[in-house]
Structures are given as C-alpha cells and as structure tokens.
C-alpha cells in the first residue's frame, strides 16, 4: 500500500503541504471510504470481473473532490473498480466546453465528454418565470444512464455531499409532505444501474476548501440563469441560520437520518402498529420527548 502522505496521482499535483490541508484531505478520504463500505457500493462479482463506475463531473467543487478522492482510494488499492469520468455538456450559454476535456487529459483520467443540447429543450418546455432545474435534471439523468450503459458501467456516481442530502430531506419535509432524501445507494427505475453518492458523509465546506486549495478549474453552476429563488436556496439559508445559532446542528440532523425509529413515527407501512401488544420487544425510551439541545 502506498504511503498516505505521498502524492499518488496528477490530480494531487501541487497539493498544499500544510498540516491543515493534510488533515482535510485525510478526513474527506476517510469519510468517503466509510460511506463506500457502509452502504456496500463495491460489487463482489461471482465471476471476479471488475466493476466500472461512471463518475459524473460537472466542473463544480463537489465533483472535482469526488473524482480526486476516488482516484486516491483506487491508487491505494482500497477501491477495486475501474473509473470513467464523464461530463455532459448540456448546451448552456457560456459553458466553457474545453475546460474539462483539457483538465482530464492533462491529469491522465479516462473520460467521455458528450454534447447534448438539453438546454434548448428545457427553455422551450418550461413556462417563463419557472425554474429549469427539475426538467434539466431529468434530461441529464436520462443521458447519463444511457452513457453508462454504452460504456459498460454498472453504476453512475454523483458528487452530492452531506449538505445536499440534508437540504433534500427538508425540501421533501416542507414541500413534499414526506420523510425522504437522496440515499447514498439506490437502483434506477429500470433496475439495471446503481446510483452512488460516496461523498454522503462529507460536508460541503470541506469540498469547497479542498477544491479551492487544489486550484481546480471551477465552472460556475449558474450559467442558465435559473438559480435565484429556488426552494433549495431557501432551505440552505434556514440550515445556515440554525448552524450559526447552534454550531454542529447540521451534523446532529445528519446523524438523525441514520437513526430512524419507525415505531416512533406515524407510518403504518413501516411499522405494524396493529400487531403491537403489551409485553412486545418494541418498547423503551420515549422518543416523543424532545431532548434539550446543548
């Protein structure tokens, strides 16, 4: 196994030698490895073949962090999969189409760059004044699934982090009337591809610090002009306020997503309330009591 302080891939060329950055890098790698192991993302195939992942790269801080940490794990022998980086150029006005191909080629990262003008479709279909995000995301997802199949990949790997998952939970809670979020691992509707989110335990702030320290060529995410007033931005502001008033609240809330008690919720599809009887094992602490936040 390679020494943990060794720069093992061109993606880490010029990495800061500061103690602070080394701690940051080690923390991101540890959390990513934990998520991969905890949620069983690496397939153990009976025929001994190596799984192949399509790593989706948008040019934002999160996807650069994802790509770098996956390559670090792979080069350390801790991630026995083949990686193919993929960028889908959706025809957004002003998108710098040469940035990612040049970066990936310079880094020696196998990649597929594909142009699909979904932007024009979205502009044509979405009424004026509405945000493009939902339809744009659906079209992007369909194209990524197609590319994964064409490339023989068993999984599409996305750069969503802890804060994305928390925000999605509260969006579902506030606007969808359900307790749900982005899972770290799922199977697509067709049943032929996994979708993985290895950065599920990594904080957005860490991704931002990492990508900035590495000086990756960040592409802005607001090229379509459809970002203002989004529900996600509103939820982010709420969470920012909670975190400011009570530092550490984000992590507490995130831990709650891994500590669900169906018997202490209200969904009869998740727990057999009808069959609950005196003397049953499902008893104990009253989770209806609100704990004092310290």
UniProtKB/Swiss-Prot annotation:
Keywords: 4Fe-4S, ATP-binding, Cytoplasm, Iron, Iron-sulfur, Magnesium, Metal-binding, Nucleotide-binding, RNA-binding, Transferase, tRNA processing, tRNA-binding. Its main location: cytoplasm. The keyword Iron-sulfur applies. GO terms for molecular function: 4 iron, 4 sulfur cluster binding; ATP binding; magnesium ion binding; sulfurtransferase activity; tRNA binding. SUPFAM superfamilies: Adenine nucleotide alpha hydrolases-like. [4Fe-4S] cluster binds at residues 133, 136, 224. It catalyses: cytidine(32) in tRNA + S-sulfanyl-L-cysteinyl-[cysteine desulfurase] + AH2 + ATP = 2-thiocytidine(32) in tRNA + L-cysteinyl-[cysteine desulfurase] + A + AMP + diphosphate + H(+). Its EC number is 2.8.1.-. The thiolation reaction likely consists of two steps: a first activation step by ATP to form an adenylated intermediate of the target base of tRNA, and a second nucleophilic substitution step of the sulfur (S) atom supplied by the hydrosulfide attached to the Fe-S cluster. Homodimer. This is tRNA-cytidine(32) 2-sulfurtransferase.
